[in-house]
């Protein structure tokens, strides 16, 4: 995409009151990261992939490449060790080998590094987890596929999340 389109995308996100983006399903285009840097959109930079973890030798090479490419972008405030069940905890230490800032490494759909990021928690489960000491930051929200379509709506989740000081939003 062009520089202008990347800027337009970031402005569109900010116009929807978003202050961060997870790069799991968004290409890690250097122009997009430049737009995030200049316009103030925080970034969770995530190893690509879908649902299966990388073996350690492959993961090490991918982490090294991702961090060497993206390390100088101030908008990146978290590294993510893969989508859903696609992470390999043996790789966690690799992130800090290449990042002199030692930004937090998180695992979407898990509880690591003080962040509770589990995908698709029900409304009741979310209430319980917000009482724990970890920062509550779901990286995907529940939808009808998992609760038969009878769960709380996004508005209900946001209202609940606003009341808890350890909840910092979601993706």
Predicted regions and their residues:
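Active-site mouth loops of central-metabolism enzymes
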Residues: 1-3
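Substrate-binding/catalytic cleft of secreted carbohydrate-active enzymes
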Residues: 7-12, 20-171
């Amino acid at each position: 995409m062009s520089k202008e389109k990347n800027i337009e995308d970031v402005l569109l996100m900010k116009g929807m009151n978003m202050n961060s983006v997870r790069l799991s399903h968004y290409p890690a285009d250097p122009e997009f990261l430049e737009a995030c840097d200049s316009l103030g959109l925080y970034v969770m930079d995530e190893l690509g992939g879908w649902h299966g973890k990388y073996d350690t030798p492959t993961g090490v090479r991918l982490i090294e490449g991702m961090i060497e490419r993206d390390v100088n972008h101030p908008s990146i405030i978290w590294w993510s060790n893969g989508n859903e069940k696609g992470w390999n905890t043996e790789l966690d230490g690799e992130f800090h080998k290449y990042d002199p800032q030692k930004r937090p490494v998180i695992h979407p759909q898990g509880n690591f590094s003080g962040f509770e990021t589990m995908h698709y928690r029900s409304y009741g489960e979310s209430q319980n987890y917000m009482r724990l000491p970890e920062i509550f930051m779901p990286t995907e929200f529940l939808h009808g596929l998992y609760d038969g379509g009878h769960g709380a709506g996004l508005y209900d989740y946001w209202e609940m999340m606003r009341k808890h000081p350890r909840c910092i939003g979601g993706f």
